[in-house]
Amino acid sequence: MSKKFNQIVFIGRFQPVHNAHVAIMRRALELADKVIIVIGSANQPRSVKNPFNVDEREMMIRQAWYKISIPTHLEIVSVEDNVYNDQAWAVAVQEAVTPLLTGEKTGIIGHKKDETSFYLSMFPQWTFIEQEEVEPLHAATIREHYFTKGTNVNFLKGVVPDSTFDFLSRFHGGPEYEYIVGEKEFIDNYKKQFAMLPYPPVFVTADAVVIQSGHVLMVTRRSRPGKGQLAFPGGFLKNKADKDGGPDRSMVDCMLRE
């Protein structure tokens, strides 16, 4: 008996893969011959929000999939974020997916849980399939507990597939894990400084884009957040600094000489 769709597209960040993701995969496979999974936020540096790289997430997806169906029914692609241009991001998704399409019946599946799910409406050429909430389970909650120092990873057993649990158990305590825990602790402590204020503070920062002889000036961050990552030179503006002036020119000149 033929299925309703030739393929169904499932977009997510999968940070990490959890039981609700698996439930959506199962539903998609009931409705289509093939499932195309789009991994978002590709090539992001490790952070509390994006702790796992594309290869790690693809591995989690494939290992969970093996419990559901055969590999030939699954295609996986990845796309980078385009923070300031949703349309450019949508084009990138379509360019990644289109070569994999067979037949005319394509669906896109997901759960519209909040305003962050707006992307599900950006592909009118694909039939939207609403997935009801399986359980009140969010990857952000999993990350919050998992990357808290001293957490017993056994709490994950009830919310992620066995293969994801095995991966997270191996990842736990490693250098990448400790880096993210340190980032989380820094951010949490930073926010605590202002928790009792009647209004949230507004900080103004500015970075410089310096081009010299066809090269763009970059620095390596020496402190958290983002310690060890590349960045444009800049930072907080002084209280009386002109916001249009941006970073101190002498600072940039010094960096160029070095």
Located regions from the model:
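Generic secondary-structure boundary/loop-capping signal
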Residues: 134, 139, 227-229, 234
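N-terminal strand-loop-strand
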Residues: 192-232, 241, 245, 252
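Short strand->helix junction
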Residues: 14-15, 237-239, 244
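A short, flexible beta-alpha/helix-coil linker loop
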Residues: 41-45, 224-225, 237-239
